Each structure stands twice: as structure tokens, then as C-alpha cells.
Amino acid sequence: MSAPMAPRIAPGGRRDIGIVNWGICRALGVASGTPPPNLFTTLGRQRGLFRGWLYFAGRLMPGGRLPRRESELVILRVAHLRGCTYEWEHHVRLGARAGVSDDDLQRIQIERTTVADGWSAREAAILAAVDQLHHTQEIGDEAWGDLRSHLDEREAIELLLLAGHYEMLATTILTLGIQPDPHRRRG
């Protein structure tokens, strides 16, 4: 099965998503260097749910307990594993601001998760957990023990919610055929 080539639900304009959601989408576009993002203007059609989802998503990233770089590594790994170009392109830009290097991006795509591959022990444990969540929808005892040796319980819960959220988001993006946003050059 493959994702649709064109949007199944087109991004909405101001009238479709409401003035409040439109304002939010425009502000988020300015922050990300794009027009109002297609993801937000599509989900904005579900007006109240959109704002609730945005609050939840914002509490995970950028407002979560995990360092921003680690959150971006999680999101990029999920985007890669799911083949979600929209999230990959968006978070390559955001990840660069959080310290994700070109080397990190290469390693994320070859799915190496050890200290020998250049990750810190904490990053390796996080990425191994994300991989297990993606492939089996749970984390085994050994990987969980490794993860918990690096993350406190609040961080561990947040990691599960962050990875699960971006799995859900990839499903939504791919199913709806949400197209990548054109990137505006700042100059």
C-alpha cells in the first residue's frame, strides 16, 4: 500500500479553518520558514480538536522534559522508519537548530543504535527504544532497563508519548496525502 500522490483532504484556508486557527497556522509558518504549514491547515479543518492536539503536541516538543536535540532525534527516526517525507523535511530544519548534525542524519537513516556508531549511551538507548516501539509496538525488558538507566520515569513516559505521537502523525500525514511545505529562504 502506498500513500496518495495528491491530498485526500486539501489544506484549508482562513474560512475553512477559522480565524483563530488561521492565525496560529500563519505564526507557525513564520517560525518554520514556510507558508502556513499544510499539516496544520489540513488538521485545522477539525477546529477544536486541532487546538487540543496542538496543545498536546507542544507539551511534548518543544515544551517537554527531554532535551530538544533528543526529541528531534526521536522524531527524525520515526519519520525515517515510517517513510514520512513531510515530517522528515520539517524536522531536518528544526533539528539543525537543536544541534542535529548532517552526520546524525546519516546515522539515523542507517538505523545504527550503538555507542560505537557515534551516539552517546543515552542517545543509543533512546533510539533503540524508538526502533523497538516502531517494529513491535512495545519495548522489551532489556531495552527498557537500558533506557531507564539513562532516563528518569517522567522522561521515559514522555519518550513513549513522543514516539507514539509521531507514529500517529505519520499515519495521518501519509493517509491524507499531506504534501511537504515549500521552504522560504530567509534573507
PLM features per residue range, with description:
Residues 1-187:
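Hydrophobic alpha-helical segments
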